Amino acid sequence: MSQFSHFNEQGRAKMVDISDKSSTMRTAVAASSVRMIKEVFHKIEQREIGKGDVLSVAQVAGIMAAKQTSTIIPMCHPLALKGVDISFDWEEDGNAHILNIQVQVKTKGSTGVEMEALTSASVCALTVYDMCKAIDKGMIIGPTYLIEKTGGKNGDFHRASDI
């Protein structure tokens, strides 16, 4: 098992020094989902939610979240992201509908973008919940997980199967 690098000699948290790491292309893809009743699905699709176009707002919120990850996750480095792409698709499951969210983040730098992708996917889901909670407070968020990451000295990661 590898040692955690976010602790100093005193066992206190520190931001890892990445100044000696080479700059390479880094990507990460993360996913989340929101399970909801049919009524919410139909109102989102018909753009009848009082707070606005849910998917457009969630998409912008997700992009903003990716760019702000280092301000809310203490040990994340601020990164100059090169791209954030968010896609949505619907799945029907009995009486419920599931909004699947997928986020791809890219940069060229000396640290990965997994946390940016995960934060973005999470904030997309939270935004959908916030905009629709007046209709259904029983929506279920998640799971939220990393699908893949590329670049860096630890190599690539590709999830073996869907969750």
UniProtKB/Swiss-Prot annotation:
Reaction catalysed by this enzyme: (8S)-3',8-cyclo-7,8-dihydroguanosine 5'-triphosphate = cyclic pyranopterin phosphate + diphosphate
Binding site for substrate: 75-77, 115-116
UniProt key word rRNA processing: no
Signal peptide region: none
UniProt-annotated catalytic positions: 130
Catalytic activity, EC: 4.6.1.17
GO molecular function per UniProt: cyclic pyranopterin monophosphate synthase activity
Entries under InterPro entries matching the protein: MoaC, MoaC_bact/euk, MoaC_sf, MoCo_biosynth_MoaA/MoaC, Mopterin_CF_biosynth-C_dom
Keyword annotations: Lyase, Molybdenum cofactor biosynthesis
Pathway: Cofactor biosynthesis; molybdopterin biosynthesis
Single GO BP term: Mo-molybdopterin cofactor biosynthetic process
Family membership: Belongs to the MoaC family.
Assembly and interaction partners: Homohexamer; trimer of dimers.
Function: Catalyzes the conversion of (8S)-3',8-cyclo-7,8-dihydroguanosine 5'-triphosphate to cyclic pyranopterin monophosphate (cPMP).
Protein name: Cyclic pyranopterin monophosphate synthase
Species the sequence originates in: Bacillus pumilus (strain SAFR-032)
Gene it is expressed from: moaC
